């Protein structure tokens, strides 16, 4: 008696067809993502070179202007933003101080945020000056801060900065980390959106510790308050 081969159940056939179709879709998506990642990497490299060249050209023009002013006094352009670091606990602080710290998203010790330099911000900094160190920083330190400690916000989730994540969050208007730095440093119309996207920077305690008594004003040999353009001395040791 000859054996009769039974046909595979229709459900099994449909399952195999589905798995094969999904495998093709995954392969296509992976290929598209690799191509996108490669294109974004090229874009980031070209954009970084272009923006840095523009910045260094501006710096050269400033140096030339300084050297040409023999008897005059060069007044540098006011910084577009402040870096603000929470270095003292908010426990037992007045409600007004706590409110400003919350507005600045300063929730834990050794957290740094960037805020636009304007009249309103300067008033708020005076309210919290006994709990924070703040001042201005240069392009190189800003780049180091964003590249090494930067992360982005997706809803309430903290996400590592990648070109693809940035591109998705800004609908292609911004595609790399260097463009984030550019908008912050130059205070462009995208400053607010970029700054809201960046998660507060979580820093380490400063190498070598704080100079003097931390609770004393920077002008009196301590650490809190306005460091002006000397904040980089502290921030560099916390990155």
From Swiss-Prot:
Residues 1-22 are annotated as: Disordered. It holds the Pfam family Ribosomal_L30. Keywords: Ribonucleoprotein, Ribosomal protein. This is Large ribosomal subunit protein uL30. GO terms for molecular function: RNA binding; structural constituent of ribosome. GO terms for cellular component: cytosolic large ribosomal subunit. CDD domains: Ribosomal_L7_archeal_euk (cd01657). InterPro entries: Ribo_uL30_ferredoxin-like_sf, Ribosomal_uL30, Ribosomal_uL30_euk_arc, Ribosomal_uL30_ferredoxin-like. One of its GO terms (biological process) is maturation of LSU-rRNA from tricistronic rRNA transcript (SSU-rRNA, 5.8S rRNA, LSU-rRNA). Belongs to the universal ribosomal protein uL30 family. Disulfide bonds: none annotated.
């Amino acid at each position: 008696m000859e054996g009769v081969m039974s046909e595979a159940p229709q459900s099994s056939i449909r399952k195999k067809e589905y798995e094969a179709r999904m495998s093709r879709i995954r392969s296509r998506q992976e290929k598209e993502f690799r191509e996108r990642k490669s294109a974004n990497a090229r874009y980031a490299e070209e954009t970084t070179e272009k923006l840095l060249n523009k910045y260094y050209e501006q710096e050269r023009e400033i140096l030339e202007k300084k050297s040409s002013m023999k008897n005059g006094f060069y007044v540098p352009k006011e910084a577009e933003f402040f870096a603000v670091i929470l270095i003292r606990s908010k426990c037992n602080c007045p409600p007004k101080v706590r409110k400003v710290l919350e507005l600045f998203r300063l929730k834990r010790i050794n957290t740094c945020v960037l805020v636009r330099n304007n009249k309103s911000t300067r008033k708020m900094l005076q309210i919290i000056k006994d709990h924070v160190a703040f001042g201005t920083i240069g392009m190189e330190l800003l780049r180091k801060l964003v590249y090494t400690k930067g992360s982005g916000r997706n809803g309430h989730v903290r996400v590592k900065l990648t070109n693809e994540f940035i591109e998705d969050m800004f609908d292609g208007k911004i595609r790399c980390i260097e463009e984030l730095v550019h908008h912050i440093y130059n205070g462009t119309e995208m400053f607010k959106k970029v700054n809201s996207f960046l998660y507060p920077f979580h820093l380490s305690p400063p190498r070598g510790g704080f100079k003097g008594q931390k609770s004393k004003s920077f002008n009196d040999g301590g650490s809190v308050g306005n460091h002006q353009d000397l904040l980089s001395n502290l921030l560099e040791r916390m990155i």
